[in-house]
Amino acid sequence: MKQYLDLCHRILNEGKWVKNKRTDKLCLTVINADLTYDVAKGEFPLITTRKSFWKAAIAELLGYIRGYDNAADFRQLGTKSWDANANQNADWLANPYRKGVDDMGLVYGAIGRKFPKADHGSLDLLKQIVDDLSNGIDNRGEIYTFYHPGAFHMGCLRPCLYSHHFSLLDGTLYLNSTQRSADVPLGLNWNMVQCYTFLALMAQITNHKAGQVFHKIVNAHIYEDQLALMRDVQLKREPFATPTLTINPAIKSLEDLEIWVTLDDFKVENYFYHPSIQYPFSI
């Protein structure tokens, strides 16, 4: 939590204004931020200076794990996070690759679970990683990536948190996650939860101890219409103690995550928080 608040203060104190072409808004921006989440110690990085909807963040992660490409599937899991980009993005609505209402196209897990090969066909990157790690193999390239520039035109949004690199060392599983762009008041709140939960899940289904997540953010920003709420409201609040996340121990495999796991299999305890803040969302 302190890391997150420190980053917010850094943006306010050191950030430079940049005009974002896609949203036509100014962003107060810094380059490079490194956050660490200690899964081994149970330090769940959930924001307490405002209410965070952690269930929706985990629902979105489950959708990425399953390779979903439709906002309706995400809603069924428990999040409406893709409704706007699938159905209100003017460029995507006019895109010939859009299949209809709620279609997201080739984004996130839809790329990672069927990564297009140059010689045709596709690779299931996540299954390869799970198979390797389950057999104690780390080939130094256990990377679940959603980043495919050749397919950007076939999806409603380029991936922001685009790469998850798993490493196995002496029986402990680590994760390096890379994010090209972070809407710090809104998106990063969820991304921190997702990185932590992803490592915890992968360690559990591959039968390893969980170590740390190292989360690199390249472009961290606060939109101009979010700035006052961050500066004058959220950063004036004192954080509460860190809550804890518990995952159903019956989850044993990738197939479990694909077939039957729901939000009921995740519990957060001792979560105390300040009132929610309605930050503007930029499509």
Swiss-Prot record:
Keyword Cytoplasm: yes
Keyword tRNA processing: no
PANTHER family noted in UniProt: THYMIDYLATE SYNTHASE, THYMIDYLATE SYNTHASE 1
The protein's name: Thymidylate synthase
Name of the gene this protein is made from: thyA
Pfam family for this entry, one: Thymidylat_synt
Subcellular location: Cytoplasm
Family: Belongs to the thymidylate synthase family. Bacterial-type ThyA subfamily.
Source taxonomy: Bacteria, Pseudomonadati, Pseudomonadota, Gammaproteobacteria, Pasteurellales
First-listed, main subcellular location of the protein, grouped into a coarse class: cytoplasm
